[in-house]
């Protein structure tokens, strides 16, 4: 693993306990309680964002894998994008592991969701990265294995070019009978288009969601951190979807 230097960790922790960050928590809590979604503007300081973006670009240039497949457990919905696995990120980024391991981050998330927030026990799903960049690239409808996804956005296309988060909240996932078309048709489908530099928290285990297709070449680059609830740790997860993609 690449060394997550003490200055980086200290900067991350200091930002997450700063008055400015904490001042946003009541509004984030309200958004999450109403929508199972909360967008955190300026998730990290500019210097951290810029250095992490450079790390990601280098990793995508040298260690990424292109995927073009359908995932059976989510109704054979498509995945067309480029991926970075957790271990590639851990070995090539100083910041992303520090963010995932931050006790201040988990404490802030617990205030937002009003539950205990835990690191996921399955290491390959702790954090991953994807890049949509070709026309037709899409991260099709799916649920996550664990309760929460925290998605840090590094590049985002114009809203009229796709790349938006679309979701239907409060729907169960049965991998043997996912009923994706039924849930999407019944809706309501909520659309969000977060900006680069922001992060969003989604109750992804009970929210059917996708990243809408790109209509022309552009970039949507993100890192997804997964966090577990106490209930998650008592449940079995087969991890077939994550294994197929990363």
Label the predicted regions:
Residues 1-78, 98-103, 243-246:
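N-terminal auxiliary "cap/dimerization" subdomain that precedes the catalytic jelly-roll/cupin core
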Residues 32-39, 85-95, 224:
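Glycine-/proline-rich flexible loop or hinge segments
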Residues 60-64, 116, 231:
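A generic secondary-structure signal for well-formed alpha-helical elements
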Residues 110-115, 119-199, 205:
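Catalytic core of non-heme Fe(II) oxygenases with the double-stranded beta-helix
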Residues 163, 173-246:
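Catalytic core of Fe(II)/2-oxoglutarate
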């Amino acid at each position: 693993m690449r060394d997550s230097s003490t200055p980086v960790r200290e900067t991350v922790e200091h930002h997450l306990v700063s008055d400015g960050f904490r001042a946003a928590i009541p509004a984030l809590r309200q958004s999450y309680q109403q929508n199972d979604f909360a967008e955190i503007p300026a998730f990290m300081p500019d210097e951290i964002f810029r250095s992490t973006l450079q790390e990601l670009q280098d990793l995508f240039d040298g260690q990424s894998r292109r995927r073009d497949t359908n995932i059976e457990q989510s109704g054979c919905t498509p995945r067309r994008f480029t991926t970075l696995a957790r271990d590639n990120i851990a070995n090539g980024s100083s910041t992303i592991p520090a963010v995932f391991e931050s006790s201040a981050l988990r404490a802030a998330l617990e205030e937002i969701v009003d539950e205990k927030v835990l690191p996921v026990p399955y290491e390959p799903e702790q954090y991953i990265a994807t890049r949509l960049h070709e026309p037709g690239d899409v991260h099709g409808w799916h649920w996550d294995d664990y309760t929460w996804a925290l998605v840090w956005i590094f590049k985002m296309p114009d809203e009229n070019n796709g790349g938006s988060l679309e979701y239907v909240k409060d729907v169960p996932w049965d991998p043997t009978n996912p009923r994706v078309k039924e849930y999407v048709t019944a809706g309501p489908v909520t659309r969000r288009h977060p900006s680069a530099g922001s992060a969003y928290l989604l109750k992804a285990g009970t929210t059917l969601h996708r990243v809408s297709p790109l209509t022309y070449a552009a970039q949507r680059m993100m890192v997804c951190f997964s966090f577990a609830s106490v209930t998650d740790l008592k449940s079995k997860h087969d991890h077939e979807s994550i294994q197929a993609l990363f």
